[in-house]
């Protein structure tokens, strides 16, 4: 019997740290907006949580983000920094997680790496968008993360550009 898989791309615009990364992300994301994926826009990253539906054997999550979002200080509380930890508790050993980070991103601590190994099916990270070979996603979740301690004006501007494209996109 064929495994039922859900492929989700999560894009947090705080990944953008400079003009080059803005250009790279826009070039990567814009073509995906016109494919047959469900596109979800939201200001807050942890609002992705309800889009992980039960009934799948495997969840493939690609997360383009400056932060790993697995578990930070208050990891028992569902928020923008801990949503993957909460998903990994619900979908134990079913999530293949690929984090597209920045060279400046802080990687999970040893304590969190142990939790990652115990709860995720797999975990990989890379700083290059080209590491994402998948071109078809069931869902694409794009968030802004507008808090000034997390994002830059380039990241917020990119989110607003994507939001405008989606608002102007003809519906079928």
Predicted regions and their residues:
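Conserved alpha-helical scaffold segments that buttress catalytic/binding sites
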Residues: 2-172
């Amino acid at each position: 019997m064929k495994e039922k898989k859900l492929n989700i791309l999560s894009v947090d615009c705080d990944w953008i740290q400079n003009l080059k990364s803005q250009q790279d992300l826009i070039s990567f994301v814009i073509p995906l907006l016109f494919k047959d994926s469900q596109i979800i826009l939201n200001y807050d990253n942890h609002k992705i949580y309800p889009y992980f539906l039960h009934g799948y054997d495997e969840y493939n999550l690609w997360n383009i983000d400056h932060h790993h979002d697995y578990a930070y200080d208050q990891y028992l509380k569902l928020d923008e920094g801990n949503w993957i930890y909460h998903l990994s508790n619900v979908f134990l050993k079913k999530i293949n997680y690929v984090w597209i980070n920045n060279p400046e991103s802080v990687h999970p601590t040893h304590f969190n790496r142990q939790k990652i190994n115990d709860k995720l099916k797999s975990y990989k990270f890379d700083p290059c968008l080209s590491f994402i070979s998948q071109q078809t996603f069931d869902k694409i979740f794009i968030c802004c993360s507008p808090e000034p301690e997390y994002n830059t004006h380039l990241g917020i501007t990119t989110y607003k550009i994507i939001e405008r494209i989606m608002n102007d996109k003809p519906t079928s």
